[in-house]
Design a protein with these regions (language model features):
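N-terminal beta1-alpha1 cap of cysteine-dependent amidohydrolase-like domains
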Residues: 1-80, 84-88, 208-234
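Flexible, glycine-rich phosphate/dinucleotide-binding loops
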Residues: 12, 48, 68, 101, ...
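Short glycine-/acidic-enriched loop or helix-start segments at secondary-structure transitions
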Residues: 15-16, 51, 70-71, 103-105, ...
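A structure-centric signal for secondary-structure junctions around beta-strands
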Residues: 56, 118-121, 137-139, 174
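Cysteine-nucleophile active-site neighborhood
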Residues: 62-130
Length: 234
């Protein structure tokens, strides 16, 4: 299986030194789950894309500090690539910004969350008709770190999970697109460092509450297993 990481951000040097860039984070967790995966990385911020769609079996769009509705040339180009992947029914996974950008590209809407930053570990609940992922009402924990959220889903998409703090936590389109607002690639140490970096922005109350949620166990391995099974499924 070949997975192409469409990288949409560059982390600060201090974070890069401790944790690596996003492609390294995703490679670490994906290879832990499935050591035989081949992983390729494309720096779409600078216009690097696969020469052919079939270079990889699936593509994954990372998180980013920018917004899905920003009018940046590379974001517009990536939205067009998403539409091309969708047209060819190529497997595509979106995480955080990737989740939002897929929704924006295919007719949905992304806006600032009225409640502000959603940070820490939170549980999302699966909806009905999610047999591939688990039974209805089953919960799964992921690390969240976002201030934008999907407020309108694409017409052809299916809402698969919601949480109290994130109404659109998981989406799918037919059998080839799957996306999550939460992070599978973050570990708790990185999440803590992000919270510390944004402490003054979050405010002390939200910061402390978010830190307390990090005592819970994120179920990223379960979600990674869902993603890999989704990619393998015809």
């Amino acid at each position: 299986m070949k997975i192409g990481i469409l990288n949409t951000d560059t982390l600060k040097t201090e974070f890069d030194t401790k944790y690596g860039q996003y492609p390294a984070m995703f490679s670490k967790v994906l290879l832990h789950a499935e050591p035989k995966i081949e992983i390729y990385s494309y720096e779409v911020q600078t216009g690097e894309y696969p020469v052919e769609l079939n270079e990889c079996d699936a593509y994954l769009i990372t998180g980013s500090k920018v917004s899905a509705y920003d009018d940046l040339p590379w974001i517009i180009e990536l939205k067009n690539f998403i539409r091309t992947l969708h047209q060819h029914q190529k497997k595509l996974v979106g995480i955080c910004f990737g989740h939002q950008l897929i929704a924006e590209a295919l007719g949905g809407k992304v806006e600032r969350a009225k409640e502000g930053w959603n940070v820490g570990i939170h549980a999302a609940t699966l909806k009905k008709n999610t047999i591939l992922f688990g039974s209805a009402e089953q919960e799964f924990n992921l690390i969240y770190n976002h201030q934008d959220q999907v407020t309108k889903i694409p017409q052809e998409s299916k809402l698969l999970a919601s949480s109290r703090t994130c109404p659109v936590a998981m989406l799918a389109i037919e059998n080839h697109i799957l996306s999550f607002q939460g992070h599978i690639e973050f570990d708790v140490a990185y999440a803590k460092d992000l919270l510390q970096m944004r402490r003054s922005i979050l405010g002390e109350d939200k910061y402390l509450k978010a830190c307390k949620t990090l005592d819970a166990i994120p179920q990223d391995l379960k979600v990674i297993d869902w993603i890999l099974n989704f990619i393998k499924k015809d």
